[in-house]
Amino acid sequence: MGFVKVVKNKQYFKRYQVKFKRRREGKTDYYARKRLVVQDKNKYNTPKYRLIVRLSNKDVTCQVAYSRIEGDHIVCAAYSHELPRYGVKVGLTNYAAAYSTGLLLARRLLQRLGLDTLYTGTTDVTGDEYNVEPVDNGPGAFRCYLDVGLARTTTGRRVFGAMKGAVDGGLNVPHSIKRFPGYDAESKKFNAEVHRAHIFGLHVAEYMRSLEQDDEDSFKRQFSKYIKLGVTADAIEAIYKKAHEAIRADPSHKKKELKKDSVKQKRWNKRKLTLAERKNRIKQKKASFIKRLQAQAEA
């Protein structure tokens, strides 16, 4: 059969069905979403939880959510911009920061559910494979599935760093070691030391040292924030170790305090008057009008 040209007449447009809005905008992969959202029919009203990881230029977002007809419900969330509270003040979008954000999400969620003492995860971070074991005579481990959105799932991606942090924090996320840094596809072998180096930011420290020796100007430009805050290559591992301990000690969310002496915002339009102010304004207008009438009568 040869090529048949589509005739875009009245009948064509009457029957035309547009794709979903988020598909048209290129924001949602509905092929993947369907498989992440649809629950087994024998589990009835049990939600299917997703570990959502999204990366931006300045932040790493980790959320646990489940789907309903009216929309997704967020159970818990953690962001890399919270890490300065735990001692990590720079490099909030690298692999180590993604791991820390995933760890923060896991500990925060389990604390809310009252499972933080039963499922502590692993405190010995070796970079090797770890899976949460369910406890006997108790509630099972919290199970969720990784949702990477439109991100490419290549080996060494930061989304898998966030997932590893969540798993080490005590969540049950089905995964394999094939996408972690240190896995060689040709030899099919996994080097856990390479993965551990990424978790503690040692790859950043190594690059800092090499760049400082090769090109000092580039080093000062690329690592200006590190230099400003006095973060050296030798101190990076200790910073992340302390951050992991601090996250486990207190993963709860802290509300941002408003600054007392903050700058007063400019207002470009008039503020609406209250009822009392409107009544007072009318009263003044009446008094002024009566006074003017009296002055005219006397004249």
UniProtKB/Swiss-Prot annotation:
<keyword id="KW-0687">Ribonucleoprotein</keyword>
<keyword id="KW-0694">RNA-binding</keyword>
<comment type="similarity">
    <text>Belongs to the universal ribosomal protein uL18 family.</text>
</comment>
<protein>
    <recommendedName>
        <fullName>Large ribosomal subunit protein uL18</fullName>
    </recommendedName>
</protein>
<keyword id="KW-0689">Ribosomal protein</keyword>
<dbReference type="GO" id="GO:0008097">
    <property type="term" value="F:5S rRNA binding"/>
</dbReference>
<keyword id="KW-0963">Cytoplasm</keyword>
<dbReference type="GO" id="GO:0005634">
    <property type="term" value="C:nucleus"/>
</dbReference>
<dbReference type="GO" id="GO:0003735">
    <property type="term" value="F:structural constituent of ribosome"/>
</dbReference>
<keyword id="KW-0699">rRNA-binding</keyword>
<comment type="function">
    <text>Component of the ribosome, a large ribonucleoprotein complex responsible for the synthesis of proteins in the cell. The small ribosomal subunit (SSU) binds messenger RNAs (mRNAs) and translates the encoded message by selecting cognate aminoacyl-transfer RNA (tRNA) molecules. The large subunit (LSU) contains the ribosomal catalytic site termed the peptidyl transferase center (PTC), which catalyzes the formation of peptide bonds, thereby polymerizing the amino acids delivered by tRNAs into a polypeptide chain.</text>
</comment>
<dbReference type="GO" id="GO:0022625">
    <property type="term" value="C:cytosolic large ribosomal subunit"/>
</dbReference>
<dbReference type="Pfam" id="PF14204">
    <property type="entry name" value="Ribosomal_L18_c"/>
</dbReference>
<dbReference type="GO" id="GO:0006412">
    <property type="term" value="P:translation"/>
</dbReference>
<dbReference type="InterPro" id="IPR025607">
    <property type="entry name" value="Ribosomal_uL18_C_euk"/>
</dbReference>
<dbReference type="GO" id="GO:0000027">
    <property type="term" value="P:ribosomal large subunit assembly"/>
</dbReference>
<dbReference type="InterPro" id="IPR005485">
    <property type="entry name" value="Rbsml_uL18_euk"/>
</dbReference>
<keyword id="KW-0539">Nucleus</keyword>
<comment type="subunit">
    <text>Component of the large ribosomal subunit (LSU).</text>
</comment>
<dbReference type="Pfam" id="PF17144">
    <property type="entry name" value="Ribosomal_L5e"/>
</dbReference>
